[in-house]
Amino acid sequence: MAEAEAAQLKEEGNRHFQLQDYKAATKSYSQALKLTKDKALLATLYRNRAACGLKMESYAQAASDASRAIDINSADIKALYRRCQALEHLGKLDQAFKDVQRCATLEPRNQNFQETLRRLNTSIQEQLRVQFSTDSRVQTMFEILLNENSEADKREKAANNLIVLGREEAGAERIFQSNGVALLLQLMNTQRPELLLAAVRTLSGMCSGHRARATAILHAVRIDRICSLMALENEEMSLAVCNLLQAIIDSLSGEDKREHRGKEEALVLDTKKDLKQITSHLLDMLVSKKVSGQGRDQALNLLNKNVPRKDLSIHDNSRTIYVVDNGLRKILKVVGQVPDLPSCLPLTDNTRMLASILINKLYDDLRCDPERDHFRKICEEYITSKFDPQDMDKNVNAIQTVSGILQGPFDLGNQLLGMKGVMEMMVALCGSEREADQLVAVEALIHASTKLSRATFIITNGVTLLKQIYKTTKNEKIKIRTLVGLCKLGSAGGSDYGLRQFAEGSTEKLAKQCRKWLCNTAIDTRTRRWAVEGLAYLTLDADVKDDFVQDIPALQAMFELAKARTSDKTILYSVANTLVNCTNSYDVKEVVPELVQLAKFSKQHVPEEHPKDKKDFVDLRVKRLLKAGVISALACMVKADSAILTDQTKELLARVFLALCDNPKDRGTIVAQGGGKALIPLALEGTDVGKVKAAHGLAKIAAVSNPDIAFPGERVYEVVRPLVSLLDTQRDGLQNYEALLGLTNLSGRSDKLRQKIFKEKALPDIENYMFENHDQLRQAATECMCNMVLNKEVQERFLADGNDRLKLVVLLCGEDDHKLQNAAAGALAMLTAAHKKLCLKMTEVTTQWLEILQRLCLHDQLSVQHRGLVIAHNLLSADAELARKLVESELLEILTVVGKQEPDEKRAAVVQTARECLIKCMDYGFIKPVS
């Protein structure tokens, strides 16, 4: 019974294979393998699954399956040749050569085997030449580097060559086999910064994607030494060591995603102990006074990237639990650091923000309430332990910690604000005489007032205090933070015109002061950052945003701040937020008139729209932003380091880009300033909402711009996937429509682009929209298909039996919409020109084909008529019998009438095509010239 089912599954797999559905074929063969013990059938199944692997480019799997078939039958020539092909793609040329040599012995006259033998022989000779030269080059490089008397430029060149070699698989293996790790350790011992850097970068390349090498290097160099190098003040060195550790972590945790061929039961090293040791050392670095600010930042970056789960569907969050139990107090210590206090650890401007992000990611990674309660208790105990009436520094640290948590997991921060004494301590510190205390307290109040209920509490209890500090303090840093606090409280009602917190005109005064500080380059960046943050809140008020976009110096000062290398997460986020407010690209809930009436009747507050939030005002603001150079600022922000550019900021940038692209007339300016290129990374990475918004922006640009200019070089291929994602039926109609327009434009450029669109599986979606009831969607999809049919693989789908693709195109030619007819007739003309079989198939798919063709040839739109005549010419050229059928119909009369017309400038192509059709009929002898 099982054997019969296995044979049936094999046949099913063969059918899937013939239909080019290789995934389904693989599934059928795999199911059959579980059911049979018949050796001959097993060999066939493994051999067939290997063929699927080759087609899907899963070469390691293909080689493994072919090997199993050969284990059963060593003379299985198909399996041998398939393994040879797989091994060649995996770069194992010597093993591939042995397999094809065996094939050639079994079938000496097979030209294919002989040709493969010759090709592999040439490749192996070349590989050997490179390998021997690599061996000698490695030796020479180390000799130059370790020789004290070598010239400086020679040493620099040798170091750079070594780094390049370490990044190549063959080069890395040669270095490793030539006792390279020991020699690299010698280089590190020389204490010369440039040699140390070269050694670290070479090791980083050698660890990438190779677990065994990474493990050996980790044990040889030792984790404590790696961390001590990362702790150095040198930024370049710290970053290089961070990259080395990341490469080791990736390889140990299997994140390199490379296929490793071999037995499935092969021994796998247990790397958990090493990974835990790395995490433990990174946590220790956070609280060590010997570690530089740069080193602390890199340790936080590594923890941020590698501890929380990347996919929440994976249940194992043991790494997060380990860090919470063993390192949360250390992270809280970093968050609670106050730079102005003497006991502060070495920090950079980003350190506390990175620690807040880590706390946020750890909290989000917890799976249940008991885990979250445990996390909260650790935070509560830590903060409570810091409260000390005798030691003001400890109190300041406690409030700074709460402030940091409020910038991370906000819900947790809110719970901590509710602890006894926290809000009271904030207010008490505001009244302190020490400026450091005031600074921390004001910042904490700003972060605490995010929730409307808390903001209302602070408006009731703390505004007077903030105003007093603002008036009395001479310290600009405190003054600007107090101003931001007032800005935040003033914008607590959001964009709701009816919920203004302060008197009319107060927010404009605050904004004016923020703009003044923003333009003052004498103030340090960190302080000017607060001015941007103030504007991010105040620009929810339409009067403020209208004034701001008219203040060109303030706009450009903000853009320069965003472009600067010293910018941090907060600056980028605040700038992005301000631009979202100015362009009104935030989500607005749809107002249901009935609900508004109901709310008024029940005396509930109804949000009011500000008069300056109407579309005309928004369009004017967009124009002013473009004129001020917003695109170049956005392009610089997109290029920021991934540690600084968070997914939330990317989403905001995508919203701004989409709003800027709204008017087709502005898209040329956006492309000219590099907006097209800048949108691509936003469409590929970030939040789901952000990726969709960025993809929509790309679609708007791709629909009307020359792709060669908008997305120069290879970038154009990266645009395809985001556009295809917009074809999902879950997206709204406008996104579907503009994605189709963009794909139409791209598919008209080159066959390579058409191939890319086909490989991204866009064709089923395009076909789906050709059935759509919506006229514009159907037209856009048909136009896209008109370009796509130039691709051979698309033509093969029309040639395949058992589908109605050709029938749909023929029927669309008979629709009343001339634009739709034009696109469908264009596709049909291309298809019938490419394959004679399709000419015959066209006459079989529907009985109305001749009537539709005659309508096309008589169409009053010349472009449609021309395409109809081209189809007629293709049918006449395809087959004599088919030509006879056409001549016997009314089509001959139509061709004669059109052919006799005077070929003026507009009609020349139409008349010429009709005459070519008549000449074809004369060639067959169906008609004769009048003379």
Swiss-Prot record:
Expression tissues: Highly expressed in adult skeletal muscle and heart. Detected at intermediate levels in lung. Highly expressed in embryonic heart.
Predominant location category: cytoplasm
What GO biological process terms does the UniProt entry carry, in alphabetical order? cell differentiation; chaperone-mediated protein folding; lens development in camera-type eye; muscle organ development
Q: Where in or outside the cell is it found? A: Cytoplasm, Myofibril, Sarcomere, Z line; Cytoplasm, Myofibril, Sarcomere, A band; Cytoplasm, Perinuclear region; Cytoplasm, Cytosol
Q: Where would one find the signal peptide in this protein?
A: none
> What Pfam families does its record include?
UNC45-central
Q: Where are the TPR repeats?
A: 6-39, 43-76, 77-110
One molecular function GO term is:
Hsp90 protein binding
SUPFAM superfamilies per the record?
A: ARM repeat, TPR-like
- The residue spans of each ARM repeat are 169-208, 211-250, 751-790
User: Gene3D superfamilies annotated for this entry?
Assistant: Leucine-rich Repeat Variant, Tetratricopeptide repeat domain
Subunit details for this protein?
A: Interacts with HSP90 in an ATP-independent manner. Interacts with UBE4B; the interaction may target UNC45B for proteasomal degradation.
What is the name of the protein in this document?
Protein unc-45 homolog B
The organism of origin for this protein: Mus musculus
